[in-house]
């Protein structure tokens, strides 16, 4: 008997054609049509980079987070048809590049700028590799531009900002600087510090309309203090006036990193160290523009100048920015030249009270040749001063020889009674850089007797006084005179700060 029994083979089909339902009681209804899947529609509001890559854009303004995370260059967002109709046939100057959107020019500012009859400069694009910032637009064309409403963020109210024409008239009347028709600084009758208040600045009444995320005190201070201080050494050049009073606020309106870095720079100008630290931290947390953009240079300039005036600073960051800004000088642009000239001056002002900063290297900027016909005296002096402060180990006699050659070239003489306070204080800077302490003291004594209220002269004189600390013996008459001069200019600066304050100001 065979113990093995053979069974017939059964072939099983392993592939089932029907659907398997875990519920045995489920019976499909053939009369019910399946629900169609929702079709995905492509949106036209994403950034150009994500649309080209065919991925979903999170539409974060001004930079897409997808591009930021992948270290790609965000090309911005296209304008809608309604915006293009509102713009008309004339478009505003393109002040931003790739990652930044175009800043808006309000009608009030544009129309007031057109009243001057001068041609202001605007940058076409800020990418140094492909575009040139020298493409200027006439201010008469800007008068037809209407402001564009942006949905991604609430823009700042620029109604409280002074127009370029108001700043132009203010600098002519109060800051002892010539117009374009004059080649040298001329003296003028200046109002007292107490008269420079809300009566002289009617636009301060609308400061309360600023958004809550912006400091309502610093932006008026920027226009009343920082802009006049910068434009005084530009000798009232229209391009510089328009850039610092109109273009830079538009950058700050559209980009939070520029706004916070600008407020940090204004805080340090106001001697507010805590506010400078606060805004500096906020600026570093904001998304930064592309590294090859003009906006990046502007933010880095404000951050560098703020850091050098603080007790703790990152010297590597400052030196790296100086090198990059010197490389950008090859771009033939009025805006880049303005930024380089301002940075050179502010670097000298930051180092002058300290005597020197070991490890600081400003030679790359001092070797840059920026030819500007409207301010050759100040540009040449501060360039030489930056080079001297970057080489503290060299002999003082070599530095003095360079400064003497500068005075002979531009016919600058300290004891000339016909000179304006601005040119006198420029010469005091030259003596302070070369450590001619007695000449600095004599020049500041002359300025103290003139009772000048120009904020550029006051601030520069105060910094020159600080450079004389621990120089004279405590029982000498020079020491007492230095203390009197420091007290005089310090009091005038405090009164100026109080006049720039839009809140209830206490009476001193």
Curated annotation (Swiss-Prot):
Residues 15-43, 110-146, 174-193 are annotated as: Disordered. This is Transcriptional regulatory protein moc3. GO terms for biological process: positive regulation of conjugation with cellular fusion; regulation of transcription by RNA polymerase II. The gene is moc3. Gene3D superfamilies: Zn(2)-C6 fungal-type DNA-binding domain (4.10.240.10). Pfam families: Zn_clus. GO terms for cellular component: nucleus. Induces sexual development and ascus formation. Also involved in calcium homeostasis. Interacts with zfs1. Residues 176-193 have a biased composition (Low complexity). Its main location: nucleus. InterPro entries: Transcr_Regulatory_Proteins (IPR052360), Zn2-C6_fun-type_DNA-bd_sf (IPR036864), Zn2Cys6_DnaBD (IPR001138). CDD domains: GAL4. It is found in: Nucleus. Residues 46-76 bind DNA.
